[in-house]
C-alpha cells in the first residue's frame, strides 16, 4: 500500500523558502497587534516594470502571440541576450549558446538536474542564497560550504585557502554568485579570477549566478564570461527579474556551450515545455530600457547610502557598505551576546516588538550568517529611516537588557 505522503526520500532534507516564514510572522503581528510593518526582507525592486516593457507585452497579447514557443525561447530574444553580453563583457556568445527559462530559479534547477548525481559534492559560499543547497539535496547531492572572509573594513571576500581545502574527488561543481546575495558584495576582479582559475585548473564545473550584475555602485563588475575559454568550464545564469524590475514576469536564461544547451532544451521541453510567449516579446524590448535601469540603480545607491549611514548609528551593530545588489548584511554579534538570543529569535523579536522585518543570516546557510541580519534597501528612503530608527531603539533595549 502506497501513501500519498510517501514522498521522495530526499524531500526530508529540503526546507521551504524560509524568508517567507518571517513575512508570515509579520502578517500575524500586523493583524493581532495592529503594528505598522516595515519590510526589509523583500528581495525585489519596488519600482513597477518599465512602461516600454509593459507596452510590448500588451502588443504581443493583442497580436495573438500566446502560443507555445521553442523550448529554447524565441530566436529574437536569444540573439538579443547574446548581443548584450558580448557588448558588455567583450565575449563571444552565440545565439545557440543561450536558452531562455521561466525565471533564474528554473534555470538553476535545470543546471542541477543535468549534472548532479547522488553523492556528488557541490561547493557553495557560506553564506549563500538558500535555494542552491535545497535543490542539490533534493537530487541526492551534498552541499559543501566554503567560508567567505569578513571584516568591517573590507566586507566579504573569497577565502581561497578554505575553498581549495573543500575540493575532493567527489566535487562536481562550484557555485559562484556575484554580486552576492545575501551580503551585497561585489567581488573584486581578482576574486573572480581566482574562482575561474580554481574551477579550470581542477576541471570542476563553475555555475555562475550573476542575476544582480547591473546593481553595481562602486568598482568593476567582472563577469566569468570574460574568460576566453569560458566554454570549457562555465555555466552562466542570469535573468530579467532584478535588472528590469520584472520579478513576477518569470524570465531567466542560461549560457553555456552549444552541446550543453541542447541537453537543457530536452530537459526544458519535458519540465515546462517553453517560457511564456508574450513575456519573451516584452523581454526583447527590455534591452531598450537601460536609461530606466540606470536611473533605478542611481536611486538604489542613494538608498544604500542612507541605510548604511543610519545603521552605523545603531548600538551593537557593525556594518560594511556593500558595492552591489540591494542588501545590507550587518553583524549583530554584540547584540546576540548581550541579549542571549540567537539570530533567528532576534529577528522574530524585532518583528513582534517593532514591526520590522529582517532576514536572519542563518537562513543563508551554513555558519557565517549566524551573526548577521539581511536587510534589503529596495524601499524608499523615508521607510529606511523609520525602520532603522526602530532597529536602533530595539538594539538599545537589547544591549541594556542584562
From Swiss-Prot:
<dbReference type="Pfam" id="PF00155">
    <property type="entry name" value="Aminotran_1_2"/>
</dbReference>
<dbReference type="InterPro" id="IPR004839">
    <property type="entry name" value="Aminotransferase_I/II_large"/>
</dbReference>
<dbReference type="GO" id="GO:0008483">
    <property type="term" value="F:transaminase activity"/>
</dbReference>
<dbReference type="InterPro" id="IPR004838">
    <property type="entry name" value="NHTrfase_class1_PyrdxlP-BS"/>
</dbReference>
<dbReference type="InterPro" id="IPR015421">
    <property type="entry name" value="PyrdxlP-dep_Trfase_major"/>
</dbReference>
<keyword id="KW-0808">Transferase</keyword>
<comment type="subunit">
    <text>Homodimer.</text>
</comment>
<dbReference type="InterPro" id="IPR015422">
    <property type="entry name" value="PyrdxlP-dep_Trfase_small"/>
</dbReference>
<feature type="binding site">
    <location>
        <position position="181"/>
    </location>
    <ligand>
        <name>L-aspartate</name>
    </ligand>
</feature>
<keyword id="KW-0963">Cytoplasm</keyword>
<comment type="similarity">
    <text>Belongs to the class-I pyridoxal-phosphate-dependent aminotransferase family.</text>
</comment>
<dbReference type="GO" id="GO:0005737">
    <property type="term" value="C:cytoplasm"/>
</dbReference>
<feature type="modified residue" description="N6-(pyridoxal phosphate)lysine">
    <location>
        <position position="242"/>
    </location>
</feature>
<dbReference type="GO" id="GO:0006520">
    <property type="term" value="P:amino acid metabolic process"/>
</dbReference>
<feature type="binding site">
    <location>
        <position position="43"/>
    </location>
    <ligand>
        <name>L-aspartate</name>
    </ligand>
</feature>
<feature type="binding site">
    <location>
        <position position="374"/>
    </location>
    <ligand>
        <name>L-aspartate</name>
    </ligand>
</feature>
<dbReference type="InterPro" id="IPR050596">
    <property type="entry name" value="AspAT/PAT-like"/>
</dbReference>
<dbReference type="InterPro" id="IPR015424">
    <property type="entry name" value="PyrdxlP-dep_Trfase"/>
</dbReference>
<dbReference type="GO" id="GO:0009058">
    <property type="term" value="P:biosynthetic process"/>
</dbReference>
<feature type="modified residue" description="N6-methyllysine; partial">
    <location>
        <position position="385"/>
    </location>
</feature>
<keyword id="KW-0663">Pyridoxal phosphate</keyword>
<keyword id="KW-0488">Methylation</keyword>
<keyword id="KW-0032">Aminotransferase</keyword>
<dbReference type="GO" id="GO:0030170">
    <property type="term" value="F:pyridoxal phosphate binding"/>
</dbReference>
<dbReference type="GO" id="GO:0004069">
    <property type="term" value="F:L-aspartate:2-oxoglutarate aminotransferase activity"/>
</dbReference>
<feature type="modified residue" description="N6-methyllysine; partial">
    <location>
        <position position="203"/>
    </location>
</feature>
<protein>
    <recommendedName>
        <fullName>Aspartate aminotransferase</fullName>
        <ecNumber>2.6.1.1</ecNumber>
    </recommendedName>
</protein>
Amino acid at each position: 500500500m502506497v501513501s500519498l505522503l510517501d514522498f521522495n526520500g530526499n524531500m526530508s532534507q529540503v526546507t521551504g523558502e524560509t524568508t517567507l516564514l518571517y513575512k508570515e510572522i509579520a502578517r500575524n503581528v500586523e493583524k493581532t497587534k495592529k503594528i505598522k510593518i516595515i519590510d526589509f526582507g523583500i528581495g525585489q525592486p519596488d519600482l513597477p516594470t518599465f512602461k516600454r516593457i509593459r507596452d510590448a507585452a500588451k502588443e504581443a497579447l493583442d497580436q495573438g502571440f500566446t502560443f507555445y514557443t521553442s523550448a529554447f525561447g524565441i530566436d529574437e530574444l536569444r540573439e538579443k541576450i547574446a548581443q548584450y553580453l558580448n557588448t558588455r563583457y567583450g565575449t563571444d556568445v552565440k545565439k545557440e549558446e543561450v536558452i531562455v527559462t521561466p525565471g533564474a530559479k528554473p534555470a538553476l534547477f535545470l543546471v542541477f538536474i543535468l549534472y548532479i548525481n547522488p553523492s556528488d559534492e557541490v561547493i557553495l559560499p557560506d553564506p549563500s542564497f538558500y535555494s542552491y543547497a535545497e535543490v542539490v539535496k533534493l537530487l541526492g547531492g551534498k552541499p559543501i560550504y566554503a567560508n567567505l572572509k569578513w571584516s568591517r573594513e573590507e566586507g566579504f571576500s573569497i577565502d581561497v585557502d578554505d575553498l581549495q581545502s573543500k575540493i575532493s574527488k567527489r566535487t562536481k561543481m562550484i557555485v559562484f554568485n556575484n554580486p552576492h546575495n545575501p551580503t551585497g558584495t561585489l567581488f573584486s576582479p581578482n576574486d573572480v579570477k581566482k574562482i575561474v582559475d580554481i574551477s579550470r585548473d581542477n576541471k570542476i564545473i563553475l555555475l555562475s549566478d550573476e542575476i544582480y550584475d547591473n546593481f553595481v555602485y562602486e568598482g568593476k563588475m567582472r563577469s566569468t564570461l570574460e574568460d576566453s575559454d569560458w566554454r570549457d568550464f562555465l555555466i552562466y545564469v542570469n535573468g530579467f527579474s532584478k535588472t528590469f524590475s520584472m520579478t513576477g514576469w518569470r524570465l531567466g536564461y542560461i549560457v553555456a556551450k552549444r552541446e550543453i544547451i541542447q541537453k537543457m532544451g530536452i530537459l526544458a521541453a519535458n519540465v515546462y515545455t517553453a517560457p511564456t510567449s508574450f513575456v519573451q516579446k516584452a523581454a526583447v524590448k527590455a534591452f531598450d530600457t537601460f536609461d530606466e535601469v540606470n536611473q533605478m540603480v542611481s536611486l538604489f545607491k542613494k538608498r544604500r547610502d542612507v541605510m548604511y549611514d543610519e545603521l552605523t548609528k545603531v548600538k551593537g551593530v557593525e556594518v560594511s557598505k556593500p558595492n552591489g545588489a540591494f542588501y545590507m548584511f550587518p553583524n549583530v554579534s554584540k547584540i546576540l551576546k548581550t541579549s542571549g538570543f540567537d539570530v533567528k529569535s532576534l529577528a522574530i523579536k524585532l518583528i513582534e516588538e517593532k514591526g520590522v522585518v529582517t532576514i536572519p543570516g542563518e537562513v543563508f546557510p551554513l555558519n557565517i550568517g549566524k551573526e548577521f541580519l539581511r536587510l534589503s534597501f529596495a524601499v524608499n528612503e523615508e521607510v529606511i529611516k523609520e525602520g532603522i530608527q526602530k532597529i536602533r531603539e530595539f538594539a538599545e533595549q537589547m544591549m541594556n537588557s542584562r
